[in-house]
A protein has these predicted regions:
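Domain-level signal for soluble alpha/beta catalytic cores
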Residues: 9-243
Length: 243
């Protein structure tokens, strides 16, 4: 069922949540060398997906032990199974495809990693997402410690596909952009419920769109392309609240 949340209703529903800790970490950690080596071997066809998973499992098991050892009250898998903090989750949504890009929206100094982006190809939905199994493994090895799962915010999908991309052309279903915002929100409703049903009680939505919308240079560039960031930002608030 679709839940219609207006700003007033959201404010009425806000509750004060007291987490069982006074400090927290983002949740992404540097990959150990042996995991980076395994990823390279997988990319080159030297090992298969099951062999890579076994290495990931080992690295995550070791990381969780360290997190608990230093006193973290909520542990993560370090995002060790991901190539990117955001694209992996979004690309595994129904109706979304990862494609090559000429460059990232943020230019790195020194080494330039291969760029990628996303394209909306069909109705966006959430079904049988691999991140659910990722969480279940983490929850199992944590043995009762609170587990935090991190996923990109709903706004990141729209930002990447529709705002950053100068070549964006909506598919027939999304010529009315309200339908796009709605489908993204409903997909996230399903995702949040699925993680909850899997035992997740700490789901963090990571979002860099707001910082980008505050950047003077970015705002100028988007305005020159005819984009109204203030209007888009309001739509993001409504979409996240609906999600």
């Amino acid at each position: 069922n679709v839940i219609d949340l207006t700003h007033t209703k959201v404010e009425e529903m806000i509750m004060t949540v007291q987490p069982p800790f006074k400090y927290d970490v983002v949740g992404s950690f540097l990959r150990p060398d042996y995991l980076k080596k395994a990823r390279e071997e997988f990319a080159n066809g030297i090992i298969d997906a099951n062999q890579l998973k076994a290495v990931e499992d080992k690295a995550i098991l070791e990381l969780v032990a360290k997190e608990k050892e230093v006193g973290l009250q909520a542990v993560t898998d370090g995002e060790f199974r991901r190539r990117y903090w955001h694209l992996d989750f979004l690309a595994d949504l129904d109706g979304v495809e990862e494609i090559k890009a000429d460059h990232w929206s943020v230019h790195f100094k020194g080494h330039q990693p291969k760029a990628a982006t996303l394209k909306i190809t069909d109705k966006i939905d959430f079904n049988n997402h691999p991140f659910l199994e990722h969480f279940k493994y983490l929850n199992n090895i944590a043995q009762g410690t609170l587990c935090k799962m991190t996923i990109p915010s709903p706004s990141m999908l729209h930002l990447i596909c529709c705002v950053r991309s100068e070549e964006y052309t909506p598919i027939e279903r999304y010529k009315d952009e309200k339908e796009l915002y709605h489908d993204i929100a409903i997909a996230y409703q399903k995702a949040i419920r699925a993680f909850y049903d899997a035992g997740c009680r700490y789901l963090q939505l990571d979002d860099t769109s707001w910082g980008e919308f505050c950047d003077a240079d970015k705002r100028k560039a988007y305005k020159e392309r005819g984009l109204d960031l203030d209007k888009i930002a309001k739509s993001y608030v409504d979409m996240i609240n609906l999600a």
